[in-house]
Amino acid sequence: GQLNQYTGDNAATGPITINPNKQAEIKQGLIGSMLNILGTKYTRQYQELAMQSRLKIPLLFGQDVIHGYKTTFPIPLAEAASWDLEAMELTARIAATEAAAAGIHWTFAPMVDISRDPRWGRVMEGAGEDTYLGSKIAYARVKGFQGNLGDVTSVMACVKHFAAYGAAVGGRDYNSVDMSNRMLW
């Protein structure tokens, strides 16, 4: 059950009732991680349920912390325009500190996709179309999020997405991608 990952109970549009047995499954050790849990009240509640399982393996909580957690910073594309790697590392560090305080263990950031089409709806999550700048920013943001992983204010960074995800045909998210050598190189 440790590979099962569930979402939280709330979304911006209201309550989510996909799995009414979620709490019982956590107690049984059938869930290993959860996404989009908002605040220490809920992370603590779910963690206490996990400690009632036979093996007492804690849950991992993940959240998209793309440009801040409670403090909102400029979107990654705007930060990239500054070329200020120290500032980007600092904003990731602050976001990690806030997220960790809320019980979040890992973030799905930074996005390292190279944007090819301005119509793509996720351009703002990354550093744009420059591979050199994108690699430098990814390094700075991972360093900011993770710092020293022994520090309670750090969160694990998970770079995303798959190769060529940012080259979706027609700029349509989740669309086909031309992964031929000609297009990738």
Model-derived features: positions:
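Glycoside hydrolase catalytic-domain context in secreted enzymes
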Residues: 1-185
